[in-house]
């Protein structure tokens, strides 16, 4: 299939910022995250924390951190330190900072656009639970990966969840996904840069959230990562032992056969092969 370089919808990503500001302001973000607890705990968390590994005492930067849902866990459960979270949405960061004041963990939060990432420090680990699929083209992906490469310490790692390159919309059971995991897709164009329309939170139609992002094919991301100076490694999601015991293996059959996301771990080489 011919590769296509989709045009930007809004080059400064104000659409994404405005949307996440709105859902944080009206409470749907927090409510939706709570509704998706089964998915997060049993489908997404296991692969994230397995690949993240032992980060006790390691500096960690969490990009696209939202209200700090994972940022706090990387600090409190995994022992990463120091920890910083950055997000494009001021309202998300306001919420993260409020929680930090109420339950201090020593996390620093900042509003920022990863495409203009500029920090005066380095980190041993960079995470981004959902980021790359919000970018609009290969040029932007390369820019962001170079920014991340620049803030990583020697042989640091970038751990990120990304829209599944092999997701098959024809096999997607929307009703099953919504009833069990509080999300579904209403659109997923095939091919590199194909638009995906995602509805998280399990809301009724009148309150439904609609999030659009793009799928990027595996070989495209691998090539860009390699050009920047990363070694890419893909990981499939798997179900937690607790989830299997509580719900049974068949409960997760549809999800595992066609998961919404996969994990990409990029390990930094000593020097980038092709500097910009």
Map each language-model feature to its residues.
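Conserved class I S-adenosyl-L-methionine
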Residues: 2-55, 69-73
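Residues at the starts of beta-strands that form the adenosine-phosphate
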Residues: 59, 82, 157, 231
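Class I SAM-dependent methyltransferase SAM/SAH-binding core
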Residues: 61, 67-116
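A short acidic, Gly/Pro-enriched loop at the edge of an enzyme's catalytic core
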Residues: 115-126
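A short SAM/SAH-binding and catalytic strip from SAM-dependent methyltransferases
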Residues: 124-139
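A short glycine-rich, Lys/Arg-flanked "PGG" loop and its adjoining helix->strand segment in the class I
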Residues: 142-154
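SAM-dependent methyltransferase
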Residues: 159-223
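C-terminal lobe and adjacent flexible extensions of AdoMet/dcAdoMet transferase-like proteins
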Residues: 220, 224-276
